[in-house]
Amino acid sequence: MESKDQGAKNLNMENDHQKKEEKEEKPQDTIKREPVVAPTFEAGKNCAPRGGRRRFRVRQPIAHYRWDLMHRVGEPQGRMREENVQRFGEDMRQLMEKLRERQLSHSLRAVSTDPPHHDHHDEFCLMP
């Protein structure tokens, strides 16, 4: 009789132990299955900015800003811009021509046999 009572107690203890394990496993499974959601910060709810976050929002660049400025011809400001662009283009052409002339003159002087015209800064002479 005592052996039957001990066997019943052992079964009850094993069942209780299994139930406890199942209860412990269930919360872990639910934790594993839930997706991790980042906390959202709303302004005005006593949220202080964290160290890694920027305090001010950076302004995004306007796409095609230069193209937009160059092609606004309908308004009077746009016409002025177009005139400025044309004038700027002419100035650039003149500067490029001057630069080309100077580069050619230096390269031609190195090739030509004519004596230099009072430019002694680039000459080097070892004769006494």
Curated annotation (Swiss-Prot):
GO terms for molecular function: metal ion binding; molecular function inhibitor activity; signaling receptor binding. GO terms for biological process: axon development; axon regeneration; negative regulation of neuron differentiation; negative regulation of protein ubiquitination; positive regulation of neuroblast proliferation; regulation of apoptotic process; regulation of cell cycle; signal transduction. The modification Phosphoserine is found at residue 105. InterPro entries: BEX, TF_A-like/BEX. Expressed in the central nervous system. Expressed in Schwann cells from newborn sciatic nerve. Residues 117-121 are annotated as: His cluster. Residues 14-35, 115-128 have a biased composition (Basic and acidic residues). Keywords: Cytoplasm, Developmental protein, Differentiation, Metal-binding, Neurogenesis, Nucleus, Phosphoprotein, Ubl conjugation, Zinc. It comes from the Eukaryota. Phosphorylated. Phosphorylation of Ser-105 protects it from the proteasome. It is found in: Nucleus; Cytoplasm. Residues 1-55, 107-128 are annotated as: Disordered. Belongs to the BEX family. Interacts with neurotrophin receptor p75NTR/NGFR. Interacts with OMP. Signaling adapter molecule involved in p75NTR/NGFR signaling. Plays a role in cell cycle progression and neuronal differentiation. Inhibits neuronal differentiation in response to nerve growth factor (NGF). May act as a link between the cell cycle and neurotrophic factor signaling, possibly by functioning as an upstream modulator of receptor signaling, coordinating biological responses to external signals with internal cellular states. This is Protein BEX1. It comes from Rattus norvegicus.
